[in-house]
Design a protein with these regions (language model features):
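N-terminal ligand-binding/catalytic initiation module
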Residues: 1-107, 116, 289, 299-300, ...
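Short helix-loop-beta connector
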Residues: 122-129, 150, 203-204
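Glycine-rich Rossmann-fold phosphate-binding loop(s) that bind the pyrophosphate
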Residues: 133-135
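Adenosine-phosphate binding glycine-rich loop
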Residues: 216-314
Length: 314
């Protein structure tokens, strides 16, 4: 077998700019809605009480992808990242492996990109940004929104150093949770182990990107807050079983007809924001088609000589 290119964390981020990631993720959501891309269900394997593993496949545009990724929320106390893993991209024509990529960077970049895609489709305009949770994914949500023309912003994190560093990078301000929630576009990017948005925090015209609750039992918004919003998600089956909407669905407060998939809005097949005073909530559980969009862009960058890769022989 020929040598296989491998992109590490820094190489992935050098290969794909925030604006390219945004465009690629937007296109992937539309293509999936139109049944041009395929995505079997995500598989979870619990590793209690520490975290979980996920296997995420997708196929589109002649490529097939499998992401093997983890979520171990307690890792930072041991100096380890919460999310780690590997992405394998293969040819969907002959099955040959084409590239291996660091899953942490791919996940962070597509998570940030979908925050900007959702804001463009659902927010009232390119206004101020509140970031609640300034870890890797929160930082990339902020960077992608800034690249798309949003801001200025307020960065909040229980770790002041994280909020201060991100705010300094973007020339935004560190602030409290309440200050972040007063912004026009609010991104919640926490582990999803405690509520950070209550019904009383909602204001007319607010758009919420809920990016942290990416598995069963996780929530960043109270059921009352969720029930008060116009609801959107990345993909219904995944969001209804392991996302921000799950608790409200299980309580019988939210049903399928209340939730619109973002791809349908982007394709022009469903309405977006009901009105300027509405509060919109986008539940992002993270899709393999988004990983494929970013990985395909990175593969293209390597083939065109815009990024260097390590190589391995299998």
């Amino acid at each position: 077998m020929p040598s296989l290119p491998v992109l590490d964390h820094d190489a992935v981020l050098a290969a794909v700019s925030p604006l390219e990631a945004i465009a690629r993720v937007r296109d992937a959501l539309v293509r999936f809605h139109l049944d041009e891309w395929t995505m079997p269900a995500k598989v979870y394997m619990e590793s209690p009480p520490f975290g979980d593993f996920r296997a995420m496949p997708a196929r589109g545009d002649g490529l097939a992808l499998l992401k093997w990724v983890t979520s171990f929320p307690g890792n930072p106390v041991n100096g380890l990242p919460v999310v780690t893993g590997v992405v394998c991209v293969s040819s969907a024509i002959d099955g040959q492996p084409l590239m291996l990529l660091d899953a942490r960077s791919v996940t962070a970049l597509r998570t940030g990109a979908v925050a900007a895609v959702a804001a463009d489709a659902l927010a009232r305009g390119r206004g101020t940004v509140g970031i609640i949770g300034c870890g890797l994914h929160g930082a990339w949500a902020a960077r992608c929104l800034a690249a798309a023309g949003y801001g200025p912003g307020v960065c909040h994190d229980p770790r002041p150093d994280a909020a201060n560093a991100l705010a300094a990078e973007l020339d935004w301000d560190p602030g409290s949770r309440e200050q972040a929630l007063r912004c026009e576009v609010v991104c919640c990017v926490t582990p999803g182990l405690q509520i950070v948005v209550e019904a009383g925090d909602l204001r007319p015209g607010l758009h919420l990107n809920m990016l942290g609750a990416d598995g069963p039992g996780k929530s960043e918004a109270s059921i009352g807050a969720v029930a008060s919003c116009a609801l959107f998600c990345d993909e219904w089956e995944q969001a209804s079983h392991g996302g921000e909407l799950t608790a409200a669905i299980e309580a019988g407060i939210v049903s399928r007809d209340r939730v619109t998939e973002l791809g349908a809005v982007l394709a022009g097949d469903a309405p977006g924001r009901p009105g300027p005073e509405s509060v919109t909530l986008f539940d992002s559980t993270g899709l393999a088609i988004q990983d494929l969009a970013v990985a395909a862009a990175a593969l293209e960058a390597w083939r065109e000589g815009r990024v260097e890769a390590q190589t391995v022989r299998l």
